[in-house]
Amino acid sequence: MIKDNLVKSAFNINYMYNANGILKDARSVAVTQDDIYINMTGNSGMATAGSGDVLTGIVAGLLAIGCNVENATTLAPYIHGIAGDLVATKMPKASIMATDIIEEIKNIMPQ
C-alpha cells in the first residue's frame, strides 16, 4: 500500500510515470525528477475535508505566478503546513476547516 511507505511510493510514482507528485499525509512527501522531500510542517488538524484541495490550489497558484513545477511541488506542502500550523495557534486542531487554512495563506505569501 502507498501509505505503508510514502518515500518508496513517491519514488515509484516518479520512476513509473516520470512525474512530480505530492503524497499528502501527516508528513507529506513531495517527489521531483531529482529529489524526494519530506515536509515537516502541518498538524493533525489538517486531516479535514477539503485540505487536499487547498494543497492543490497552492500548487496551481504557484505555477500561475511563474514557479517551475519542481519548486511548486516542493513549496506547496510547506506553505500548506505552515498555514495549518498558524491556524492551530488560534483554535483547537479538531476545529480546523479547509477555509481556515486558506485564510492563513495571505499571512505567509507576499502580496
Model-flagged regions — what are they?
Residues 1-6, 66-74, 92-96:
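Short, charged, surface-exposed loops that flank catalytic or proteolytic processing sites
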Residues 1-41:
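Glycine-rich phosphate/dinucleotide-binding loop and adjoining beta-alpha-beta core of small-molecule
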Residues 9, 57-58, 83:
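A general alpha-helix detector
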Residues 17, 21, 63, 77-84, ...:
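Structural signal for hydrophobic packing residues in well-ordered secondary-structure cores
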Residues 27-28, 45, 77-81:
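Acidic, glycine-rich active-site loops and adjacent beta-strand->loop/helix elements
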Residues 38-50:
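Short pre-catalytic strand/loop immediately N-terminal to key active-site residues, enriched for Gly-Thr
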Residues 48-79:
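Short, small-residue alpha-helix embedded
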Residues 83-111:
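Charged C-terminal helix
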